C-alpha cells in the first residue's frame, strides 16, 4: 500500500506540473477549494525546516512509525503504509528536484488549495490520515489495557 501511495502521489504531481501554472489559483468550489501549484521548501503544509533537517526527520519518523505498533491488525498496517508512502512520496520530490550540492534539498510540489490552509498534496494527506489513524489505534489500545487491569 505504501508503494501505491507513492505512485499515486508522483503521478498526480506529474499531471499537475503539466497543466497548472505556478501560483495561479484554479477554483473548484468557489474560492474555498481549488488547485494552486506551489513549490514547498519546508515540511508538510509549508512548515519551514532547514533543508538538512527534513531528510533526517523523515528517516526518524519512518523508523518510529514502523516500530510504534506491534501487532496492530489491518488498520495498523494501513496507517503505517499511509505514513511511510506519504513520507517517501515527498522525499522523492526532494531528490528529483534537488539542487547541485544539496541532494535532498529539492522542493516538494503542493497543489491542493483549501481556503487559507497551507497548500498540500496526496503525500501530505496520506501522512495526516495515517498519523490520525495511528493515534486512534494507540488510544484504543490504551483503553483495552485499562479495561484489562483489575479494579
Label every PLM stretch briefly.
Residues 1-151:
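Alpha-helical transmembrane bundles and membrane-interface segments of multipass inner-membrane proteins
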